[in-house]
């Protein structure tokens, strides 16, 4: 059990000690007043496949508070949000499923062999410097072997300490209070230990009652109203503590980094609202820990090596005291051991090749009766090559994946070997490289998770592995101007086709922690992603940036012509979705407006009227003011979310909050 009083006292003492010191001038980059507007491109021409990126300053302007909040603004991403501060939040890329998306935290993949679902609501943005999304895979051949196997990848990079001349430390505090009795406090301390080594410590406390008003309205199959009332969402409280420590080191032609991370929480799970039942007795405790190390060094101009190691331990307790259901009180303990080595050799100045090997071991224990305690041994070997000409770039790779599961009775199950190739190409038609045309084809693969296969009540040992074929053609145009009205313009569009075989889909089954698993067989996905951004400076000191993102997806179940849902859109995938962001920066003021839209969709396999879900949209506003008192920089932000108080569900029967408010104070020393 978390000692709440001790943690709060510890953070308070830390703050009091810091404020008692006489501190020199601060040079934190995102809160200083800037007299001259400087625009720099975020799109790296070295990338074969351009990425989508949000950096720390942009994340601050969005008033996103978790990684999940930020990912809503990427094209091709669908977010599953169960509502409220503590609701589980997972992401899906291009309708292929969460398990095809790799998520790396400071260069090391986050794992969950139990159900494959990474709850991105657990990861705060207060220490995050950049989030990058790659479709296909990261445009680099020096990467862990398993990274070559994903259909898409998200890379979360935390802040690296940077110190001004003569300064040995940086301090940051952030406090936010908002609707649902939400209070979030975080602190970051960066310390220079030597000319080559620095440390950083980040800690955060989050608490909320999770209560918010919502409207519940449901119709019968004949169209008459079954329920129409306003109620308060209950049992959505959360208490969470996150702490992270890092050591950063620089060596000759390389670097190293060591990380300790812990996340502990207790939360209520409000559950689905079914048959006019508003409150359920579900609760969940998470105690997650991991430690990881990363080392990279170049030897001369030709050879570079990288090594990664990680150990993770996840302890989850799930309790359901709902009197209408079977009493449940189970604990799940998951361990992961991971090692990776990757090496790249420059055969010629324009031609390089890499070889990578990963080993991963996972084990799941539970106090459930007759639980089989599965262990998974996975080996990954990747061979890749890249050719980089002045106006043409191409990369190719092949990944061999070898997986074997062992159960507690000593038997082996679900052994397999799979080869997944990929090829990426990019052409710059003009010498300016403002316009690029790219294409890729890739095969990806994923094993069923432990829950898919072995969960005592709903596991399906007959599940087949899931594979996907991806084809993508796109173009990107970037233009910058050093002066004048227009400063930066970006346009990026992709047309893609994905074919998923033996697709595994997880549906919420009344309880948020449990799933119903099945193979759909085959799904064909056709889509278009469009993203554009424009920055203008109408008058001196006034910076206006607009960003639009649109996604069209047609994802059809084509398994069996005899099925009633043959060629129907798969659940929870809207045909049309998009976001719009407008940011206005003038002197010490920042105004931000963001709009999110998700079109019509269905919540079950059959596309019938009863399963139809209407489109939803939300508008969020924020206004912030920056100022300084002596050498301490402050930023105060007020925000209004869901301005028009729309009633909507992202997941059926999980109502989202109506209009809600927040007030944030940032202090940087």
Where are these regions (language model features)?
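Flexible loop and strand-edge segments within Gram-negative outer membrane beta-barrel domains
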Residues: 24, 230, 234-243, 253-305, ...
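Extracytoplasmic beta-strand/coil segments of soluble accessory domains associated
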Residues: 68, 72-109
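A beta-strand signature from Gram-negative outer-membrane beta-barrel systems
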Residues: 125-172
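Gram-negative outer-membrane beta-barrel transporters
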Residues: 353, 391, 490-499, 518-602, ...
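Membrane-embedded beta-barrel scaffold of Gram-negative outer-membrane proteins
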Residues: 302, 306-318, 437-440, 466-526, ...
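Periplasmic-side early beta-strands and strand-to-turn transitions of outer-membrane beta-barrels
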Residues: 139, 155, 188-283
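C-terminal beta-signal and adjacent terminal beta-strands/loops
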Residues: 501-502, 544, 597-604, 620-669
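Short, acidic, small-residue-rich periplasmic hinge/interaction motif at the N-terminus
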Residues: 22-60, 68, 135
């Amino acid at each position: 059990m978390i000692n709440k009083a001790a943690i709060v006292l510890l953070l308070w003492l830390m703050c009091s000690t810091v404020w008692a010191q006489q501190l020199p001038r601060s040079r934190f980059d995102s809160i200083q007043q800037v007299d001259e507007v400087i625009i720099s491109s975020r799109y790296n021409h070295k990338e074969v496949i351009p990425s989508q990126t949000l950096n720390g300053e942009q994340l601050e302007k969005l008033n996103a508070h978790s990684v999940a909040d930020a990912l809503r603004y990427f094209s091709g991403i669908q977010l599953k949000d169960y509502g409220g501060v503590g609701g589980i939040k997972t992401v899906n890329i291009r309708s292929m499923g969460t398990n095809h998306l790799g998520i790396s935290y400071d260069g090391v993949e986050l794992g969950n062999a139990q159900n494959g679902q990474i709850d991105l609501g657990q990861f705060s943005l207060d220490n995050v410097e950049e989030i990058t999304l790659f479709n296909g895979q990261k445009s680099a051949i020096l990467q862990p072997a398993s990274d070559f196997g994903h259909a898409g990848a998200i890379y979360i990079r935390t802040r690296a300490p940077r110190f001004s001349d003569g300064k040995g430390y940086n301090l940051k505090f952030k406090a936010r209070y908002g609707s649902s009795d939400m209070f979030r406090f975080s602190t970051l301390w960066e310390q220079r230990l030597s000319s080559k080594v620095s440390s950083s410590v980040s800690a955060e406390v989050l608490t909320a009652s999770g209560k918010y008003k919502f409207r519940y309205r449901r119709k019968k199959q004949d169209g008459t109203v079954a329920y129409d009332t306003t109620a308060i969402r209950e049992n959505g409280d959360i208490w969470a503590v996150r702490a992270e420590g890092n050591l950063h080191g620089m060596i000759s032609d390389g670097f190293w980094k060591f990380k300790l991370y812990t996340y502990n929480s207790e939360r209520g799970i409000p559950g689905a609202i079914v048959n006019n039942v508003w409150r359920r007795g579900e609760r969940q405790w998470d105690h997650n820990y991991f430690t990881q190390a990363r080392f990279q060094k170049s030897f001369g101009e030709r050879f570079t090596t990288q090594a990664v190691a990680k150990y993770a331990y996840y302890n989850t307790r799930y309790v359901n005291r709902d009197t209408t259901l079977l009493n449940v009180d189970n604990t799940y303990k998951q361990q992961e051991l991971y090692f990776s080595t990757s090496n790249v050799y420059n055969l010629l100045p324009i031609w390089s090749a890499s070889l990578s090997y990963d080993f991963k071991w996972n084990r799941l224990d539970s106090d459930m009766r007759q639980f089989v305690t599965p262990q998974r041994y996975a080996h990954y070997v990747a061979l890749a090559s890249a050719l980089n000409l002045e106006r043409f770039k191409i990369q190719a790779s092949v990944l061999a994946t070898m997986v074997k599961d062992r159960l507690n009775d000593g038997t082996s199950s679900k052994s397999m070997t799979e080869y997944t190739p990929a090829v990426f190409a990019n052409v710059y038609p003009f010498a300016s490289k403002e316009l690029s045309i790219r294409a890729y084809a890739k095969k990806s693969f994923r094993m069923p998770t432990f829950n898919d296969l072995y969960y005592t009540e709903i596991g399906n040992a007959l599940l087949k592995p899931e594979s996907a074929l991806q084809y993508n053609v796109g173009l990107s145009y970037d233009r910058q101007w050093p002066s004048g009205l227009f400063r930066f313009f970006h346009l990026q569009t992709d047309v893609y086709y994905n074919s998923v075989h033996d697709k595994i889909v997880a549906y919420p089954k009344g309880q948020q922690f449990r799933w119903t698993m099945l193979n759909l067989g085959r799904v064909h996905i056709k889509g278009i992603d469009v993203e554009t951004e424009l920055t203008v400076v109408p008058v001196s000191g006034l910076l206006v940036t607009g960003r639009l993102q649109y996604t069209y997806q047609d994802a059809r179940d084509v398994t069996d012509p005899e099925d009633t849902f043959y060629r129907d859109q798969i659940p929870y995938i809207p045909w049309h979705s998009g976001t719009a962001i407008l940011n206005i920066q003038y002197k010490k003021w920042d105004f931000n407006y963001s709009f999110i839209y998700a079109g019509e969709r269905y919540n079950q396999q059959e596309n019938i009227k009863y399963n139809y879900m209407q489109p939803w949209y939300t508008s969020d506003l924020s206004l912030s003011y920056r100022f300084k008192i002596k050498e301490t920089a402050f930023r105060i932000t007020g925000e209004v979310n869901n301005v028009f108080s729309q009633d909507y569900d992202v997941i059926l029967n999980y109502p989202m909050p109506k209009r809600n408010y927040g007030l944030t104070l940032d202090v940087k020393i």
